[in-house]
Amino acid sequence: MNNHANQRFHVGVYGILFHEKKVLLIKKSRGAYKGMFDLPGGGIEFGEKTEEALKREFIEETGIILDSQSFIGYNEYFCNYLNESGESRELHHLGLYYKVSAVFDKVKHGPDGHDSLGAEFIDIEKLDEMKISQIALPMIKKLLKD
């Protein structure tokens, strides 16, 4: 029998923002992707539309206000990881992905107080060398091919 207390199903919304041959990523401070780069975004609150959640998460994690969003698809990922207490957890992660654009002059580089250590633009030529979450990288590469 499964121990459901150790299982988590998470639906999140994420944005892919390109700027000068770079993509905006955040460094994760906790959870299944701790220590990895990931796309800005996160959970959808009850009653919140996906586009509203994405705008809110982008501001929280990067300080950037989005001006356009275009849905590009979804991705699923299943993994096991250790939580902050060292306990084994199972994650079923469903991500909804948008290509986004924004007018901005700076990016929030510091922690957001939740699960991000800060945001930065990463050169798209270096993506394969970086430790990027397994749910995000395929969607970034898909968009680069299109």
Each model region followed by its residue ranges:
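Acidic, metal-coordinating catalytic segment for phosphate/diphosphate chemistry
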Residues: 1-16, 20, 88
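Short connector loops at helix/strand junctions that flank enzyme active sites
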Residues: 10, 18, 34, 39, ...
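Conserved hydrophobic "DFG−1" position in protein kinase catalytic cores
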Residues: 17-18, 25, 100
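Conserved Nudix-box catalytic region and its N-terminal flanking loop in Nudix hydrolases
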Residues: 22-61
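Short aromatic/basic micro-patch
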Residues: 38, 65, 121
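A short coil-to-beta-strand element that immediately follows conserved catalytic motifs
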Residues: 65-74
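Active-site-adjacent beta-strand/loop module that shapes the phosphate/pyrophosphate-binding cleft
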Residues: 75-107
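NUDIX/MutT-family hydrolases
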Residues: 99-101, 109-140
